[in-house]
UniProtKB/Swiss-Prot annotation:
Organism domain of life: Eukaryota
Tissue: Expressed by the liver.
Organism (species): Crotalus durissus terrificus (South American rattlesnake)
Assembly description: Homotrimer; non-covalently linked.
InterPro entries listed in its UniProt record: C-type_lectin-like, C-type_lectin-like/link_sf, C-type_lectin_CS, CTDL_fold
Domain called C-type lectin: residue spans: 46-161
Pfam families linked to this entry: Lectin_C
Similarity section: Belongs to the alpha-type phospholipase A2 inhibitor family.
Localization: Secreted
GO CC annotation terms, alphabetical: extracellular region
Name of protein: Phospholipase A2 inhibitor B4
GO molecular function list: carbohydrate binding; phospholipase A2 inhibitor activity
Disulphide connectivity of cysteines: C83-C160, C138-C152
Amino acid sequence: MRLILLSGLLLLGTFLVNGHDADPEGEVLNSVLLTLMKLQKEFTNLFHAFLTVHKARSFGSGSERLYVSNKEIKNFEALKVICKQAGGQIPSPQLENQNKAFANVLERHNKEAFLVVGDSGNFTNWAAGQPNKADGTCVKADKQGFWHSTSCDDNLLVVCEFYFI
């Protein structure tokens, strides 16, 4: 989309620099301006459509964060790479509604998944007897959203967190 807009601006700039001799009626200039206005309107419509979908997803989960699984089963190190490549991060719920949205994904897939709790602020959701470093230095969430210490070598459901706006 940006490439098209930049191309239109380049064409418009070239036209203005070269003068109006090649297009005395201004047809090319009007055509370029009309195309740019259509593209701007289309971009605005796409942006509003994106916001509508985002708001609907947020409304349904009660969270401004989106938790998504690719259904793969991986260890913590592989999860870091996958989430980064996808443009997301390892889940780090900082509020109860975010943890619930995360737990909904786990319940739907009937699996457990890693999360990061170091930057979870004041919110925690440790299971009884947890954290227990003897179980491992990583943290997983069960299907109910309770947190447990676990080994980073465990293979769990890949879930990444995406934060919009």
